[in-house]
Amino acid sequence: MQNPNNLIWIDLEMTGLEPERDVIIEMATIVTDSELNVLAEGPVIAIHQSDETLAGMDEWNTRTHGQSGLTQRVRESRIDTATAEAQTIAFLEQWVPKGKSPICGNSIGQDRRFLYKYMPALEAYFHYRYLDVSTLKILAGMWAPQVKDSFQKTATHQALDDIRESIAELKHYRQHFLKA
């Protein structure tokens, strides 16, 4: 059910960090309420890319996405970028009105750069604000290192897992770092 207070969490996996030469290869979304309770998980989409594009990945991306099985899922996928964008928007429309949720995640500015270039309709679905868990991680590292160090991520670099970890990390900071 649509609620303007729901939050949209998104994560992208890309072939690299530069939107001018790299592309999106996987995306996932989760919608939570304002208390960070998961309401729905959106589609997890491997986006088809050519073998030539995949061969252009650097060593870190080649190893990481190869070991996780993502590279093979991308090769086998029949879903292009436009279809992935449309499927994700259709999911979000069920839960959050356009322009209401900030874009939520970890280092989410990087994801938004790719959305702006490759999925402008999806990028425009978000409010202009960011809910970036990385900000709290940086602040906790400076002001309360024991709080930062007490949260361990598995770092699978798979989009849905990364979102789940971002939500769990924000819950951790809410409990141990943010004081009402």
Swiss-Prot record:
Predominant localisation class: cytoplasm
Domain of life: Bacteria
GO molecular function terms noted in the UniProt entry: 3'-5'-RNA exonuclease activity; nucleic acid binding
Active-site residues (renumbered): 128
Keywords: Cytoplasm, Exonuclease, Hydrolase, Nuclease
Enzyme class, broadest EC rank: hydrolase
EC number: 3.1.15.-
UniProt-listed GO biological process terms: DNA metabolic process
Gene Ontology cellular-component annotations: cytoplasm
Compartments reported by the entry: Cytoplasm
Domain Exonuclease: 7-170
UniProt similarity note: Belongs to the oligoribonuclease family.
Function: 3'-to-5' exoribonuclease specific for small oligoribonucleotides.
HAMAP family linked to this entry: Oligoribonuclease (MF_00045)
Protein name from the UniProt record: Oligoribonuclease
Protein source organism: Ectopseudomonas mendocina (strain ymp) (Pseudomonas mendocina)
Taxonomy of the source species: Bacteria, Pseudomonadati, Pseudomonadota, Gammaproteobacteria, Pseudomonadales
